[in-house]
Structures are given as C-alpha cells and as structure tokens.
Amino acid sequence: MGSYLNPGNEAFAVALNSEIYVDKTGLLTYTNKVMNTLQGYICNSRPRRFGKSITANMLTAYYSKGCSSKEMFSGLEISRAKDFEKHLNQYDVLHWDIQWCMEPAGGPERIVSYISEKTISELKEYYPHILPEEIRSLPEALSRINAASGTKFIVIIDEWDVLIRDEAADLKTQEEYINFLRAMFKGTEPTKYIQLAYLTGILPVKKEKTQSALNNFKDYSMLHAGPIAPYVGFTETEVQKLCEVYGQKFEEVKRWYDGYQIGKYHVYNPNAVVNLMLEGEFQSYWSGTASYEAIVPLINMDFDGLKSAVIEMLSGDHVPVDVTSFQNDTVSFANKDDVLTYLIHLGYLAYDRTFRTAFIPNEEIRQELILATKRKKWNELIVFQKESEQLLKDTIQMNGNAVAKEIEKIHREYTSVIRYNNENSLSSVLSIAYLSSMQYYFKPIREFPAGRGFADFVFIPKPEFQNYYPALVVELKWDKSAVGAIEQIKEKQYGNALKDYQGNLLLAGINYNKKTKKHECVIEAMQK
C-alpha cells in the first residue's frame, strides 16, 4: 500500500463512520460498466462541498489492491450488484489529490515532476524488474509495465483543476500540466494501460479554442451530468428520508437548499443538508467554503447586461445564458454568459437545460450573493436596494400613490420599449421591484401561468418575520383598473400559494395605461 499507488481505504472509512452517510455506491455500478471502454474516461465536476473527495475515496477503497474492503461495502448498494466481488480490490489504482500535492511538491510549478517522481518510485517497488532506474516519464512507465505484464491501471485525480483555477496567470505551469494529462490519457498507447480514468474538480476539462484539451473524456457537470446525475449531490428522495429521521420539515428544507435541476433529479448541496440535520438551524452553510473574493470580481466585470442580469436573478427571475463559449478556465471571459457559466460551475447559479437559463437556486445562495455584494459595496445594487426597500415600506404602509410612482420608474428603466407591454416583462418588473423583500420573504411565487395578460406574485413572509410583515399579493396589468385588479385577486381567493397561510394579508392591484404609461395602485388589507 503506497501513498499514490494502491492506497488504502482509511479515507472512505471516515465518511462511513460519520453520523450521516448517504449511500452513493451505485456510482460504482456505472464505473464497472464503462471500465476498459471508450466511455471509461470521466471528468465529473461539481461545486465545493458536493462530495467530490468522498467519491474519489470511495472509488479507491473499492478498486485498490492495497486494501480489503468487502466488509466496508457490505450492506451498501454496490454489494447487491452481480459483479460486486469481480471488481472489488482487483486493480492497481493511482490516486492523486492535486491540492494536497501542492505543498510537498514545493509549489505549482513542481506538481508534474513531483507526482511523476513519487509515483514512479512506488511503481518500482511493485514492478522492480520492469522499470529501469533512469525512467522519468510516468506515462512511459505505465506503458512498459503494461507491455511486460498486461497490467492496466485505474487513475483517480481529485481536484484535477486546481492549477487551472488557482494558477490562471502561470501559463507555463498550466501548459506543462495539460501536456502531462494528454500524455497520460490521449492516444492509442494510453488505451492499453488505462482501465478507468476518473477526474473530479470544479471545472470541466479546459477547452482550447472550442475543443476540449482532453477530448476523449466525457464531461459530467452542473450543466449536464447524464447517467451520474443522482450521484452529484443529495437527491430529493434522500433528503426526504433524512427529514424523517431528524424531524425537519421537507418543504422548508426544499426552500432553503433545493434548486439544482440536473436531468430528472432535484439535487441538494450535501454539506448544507448534513449541517442542517446535525445543527437544526436553517441558515447559510456556504460561507465556510466559499470565497467572496472570487464572486465579487466576477459580477463586477464590465460586460454588457451582467449587472442587470445579477439583479434580475437576485429578485427571483431566470435569465438566458449561452453556456457553450466558456473555455473552462478563470481568465478567458469574453462576455456575461461566460461569467454566468462559471458561476453555475461554482454552484452560485443553477442551470435550466430545457430553457437555457440561469437562476439562483435557493434561499441559501441568494443570501450569500446579497451578503457578498454588500461587503464589497456593489454600488449599483446598494442604490437599487434602497429604492426597493422604500417600495416595500410604502406597500406595507398602503401608500398606493408612492407604490405606483416607484413601479412606473422601474418599469421604465428596466424594460425596453419593445418589451414594455410584454407579459414576461411585467413579471420581471414586479420581481425586480420587490428585490429587498428577499430579506423578509421567501422567493415570490407566480400564482397563475403566462398567457392571461397580467403578472401576479405572492410573497410569503419567512417564519421569523410573520409577526412583523404581512403576506403580499401583487398584481400588475394594463388598460384595466387598479380596483379591478384587486377584485380579480379576491375572485381567485388569493390563490393556492396562500392556502396554508394564516395572518395579515395585503392585496396590491397595479394598473397602467399602455398609451400614457401612467401607473395607478390600490392596496387593501385583509385577514386570512
């Protein structure tokens, strides 16, 4: 058992020994299926604290010849597979954590030589009669071992993208690292000695122009995870089971931590869910793992439409995004879409693959982004926040004239002439206008679908603010009347979103004239 060749199973044992462990060994069924095929080159990228290292350690514990793991996997999903024992601890495994290697290597520029030297040294102990003393190339060493003994290797690289993310300016080091990976994995020769390759990090494989630098790898990411989607984070079913065990309300957990839609799965951040179950408090558990220094420079980049897109998303809207041009690095940003795509990979945004839109996935992330912009004094947002706070105050004080003027201003500034009377624009106007409500209310709910000529939102106060803030039903329409909007809300009996709500309720009907663009507002108080 070596440090890099055939490690033991101790790291995965720590995960299994924890109070909460969610069984993700079903992934091994997939890797067993694709090993020694063209599909056996996998890059699975996901945000921080989404279980990347646990997955890498699980693969090592299952495949490595350096340990005996039958008892460890007994009772887990993989143990019920027909080929469970066929692959159990049967392979020579190479496992590198690039982040960890940085310090003993003596710096990023030494990573490739350090990994090569240390791994070759361990290979010589296993295969002393095959490798000559002077060999320095790791791909050549693996090729020689395969030619002499027929041995094939499983290669697992954790935090594969550290040099791409953290050493963005050091092009020489990056080029050396990419060339090393190419030599390891690309071409005919590597297919002879690679049984399975599994890379994990935050970024997919770096692109060069429009092509992947390792185009034989299949990228599974927060944009598309294909067959491994249920293993990216906690699924809804897994979270529901934890809620039953720990006595948490699932709908509340969903509001706070859901939002990543990957294929047919709703995916939750494992770190947040585990901390909630163990500590019992709904809050953001992201701060300990995220760097504000990384977020704010991104959203402050001088790209047309970027800041307004962030404000729209903070208010609950989805914005269109083209994810195809991003180069999978941290320096080649060409437009706002590249920035938004990177934020998706970081986990600060989610991606709707069907409609090709980006959005803020949940309450936890919304709070983190607002906090980040406040700490760095993002001036555009601060000015807008003040205006939005005044609008909320005027709404609660039932000052219809002031509300009408404020909505009219936002409608004018955030909507083009072409889209002024567009129904989706009305929705954006309402959600943007009431951005400040996010401190006290959950994400607004659109009660009725598009196609009815109006936009309506329901704002439900968070439990801790229900004694201070009423629920709000706000409707915006054109060429009718504000009173008519109020009557329509009443006819709908406030909609399904408020069926379980008990407390103070304000109805705000807003109407504007399409010709004059003059807005009017009527507000009524109700008790429910």
Task: Please report, for each region that a protein language model flagged, where it lies by residue.
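Mg2+/Mn2+-dependent nuclease catalytic core
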Residues: 174-180, 478-495
